[in-house]
Amino acid sequence: LQTLFQNCVKLGINFFNEYYALDLITVKDDDGNTQVAGVVAYELATGDLHVFHSKAVIFATGGFGKIYKTTSNAHTLTGDGVGIVWRKGLPLEDIEFFQFHPTGLAGLGILLTEGARGEGAILRNASGERFMERYAPTIKDLAPRDIVARCMVKEVLEGRGAGPHKDYVYLDCTHLGAEVLETKLPDITEFARTYLGVDPVTEPVPVMPTAHYAMGGIPTNTAGEVLQNNDTVVPGPYAAADCARVSVHGSNRLGTNSLLDINVFGKRSGRNAVEYVQTADFVPLPEDPAKEVREMLEGLRNNQGTERIAVLRKTLQEEMDANAQVFRTEETLTNVMGTIHDLRQRYKNVHVDDKGKRFNTDLLEAVELGFLLDLAEIVAYAARNRKESRGGHMREDYPDRDDAQYMQHTMAYLTGDPHSPDPEDHIKLDWKPVVFTKNEAGELNYPPMERKY
């Protein structure tokens, strides 16, 4: 990141610091196709709205892990970019697939690298048992993230959790020695000591799975171009990295592969956007392109409601942790969708304390809460619709993978008022075929197989 920033400075690139994109400016052509004309951004320092008229827009806005209480994601990762695209009627793809990293600091979600297990750290339950030997006898603690996360939660649910509330397991690094921990895994020692008061050199660290990475997002092709349906390109918008769904990770990303994703598709998106604007024309701006955002902000700022932003956000995150996390069922997903509907009604009555314009973070948090509610509902609705278990999506009531019916991508579209009580009234789910590579004989190069460890 530092290298990237230094090169931007060297090239004289202008940064609009503390500007938050809140809307994608779109217009329809004569055939009803979506065209992009730029973005509307909110300047936090002044409270002013700015219209950026552009031929192309690149979304690199990160994920939406803050729909969950326990997450490794930063506080700003509320899915604003993904939500902006969704509200414009463009689809989101495979939104139900979310990766939960096994080793987050218990109760906090701060990530402890799986490099620790790569160095030989061991997961243990309350009795000190190396429980992964029971679940994945060949690779034990080095099993894929989704499997390890489920095993950890299962240990807790079956009463083998550690701590006064029996709600976590241990990451045991004590046998690695101080030199390995201090030189190869310095973040683990620093985080455990700072946030839990635990010294990994001498005692095991309490850990539990943490919401880490959204496999789904804004659908793109390998050029980074945003797709309007299965394969139709929307001229102008591009997306890359955590907010995008180019589908190189399938339903279950492998560790560190997101870094490769960022480098490859970030570069492709940038290069292709530059190439596109060389020949493209500006799409004329609609009259008063900032009107919708202005009305939304003023409505929130002037609302005389009594609901607190923090209370609504906390309720949403806790309910998503309880009902749509590592394990999911028809009942839990239906429950959380009911909660989200109730929260939407309460959101209409939300109170913003700060009525000013300069650095009004209270107002911005209210906007972010709206995006969180949108995305949490889509995740739960798509997860309920996929009645199987695959990768980062585990249904306890449908524990097996069902390739015959569900070897396909979910495409979610906004089709009505998101405040309507039934998601079916405003969310349309469709399917997109999975692309298989085949050899000259017409056989699959990589036929689907059951994972066994």
Show where each model-derived region lies:
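Feature captures the FAD/FMN-dependent oxidoreductase FAD-binding
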Residues: 1-43, 49-53
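Short beta-strand to alpha-helix junction loop
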Residues: 1-6, 16, 71-79, 104-108, ...
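Flexible, glycine/charged-enriched surface loops at secondary-structure junctions
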Residues: 12, 18, 92-96, 164-167, ...
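Glycine- and aromatic-enriched mobile tails/lids
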Residues: 27, 124-133, 137-142, 147, ...
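Core beta-strand elements of the Rossmann-like FAD/NAD(P) dinucleotide-binding domain
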Residues: 46-56, 233-236
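Glycine-rich loop(s) and the adjacent beta-strand/alpha-helix scaffold that form part
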Residues: 56-110, 255-272
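An anion/pyrophosphate-binding glycine-rich loop and adjacent beta-alpha core
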Residues: 84, 90-206, 272-278, 318
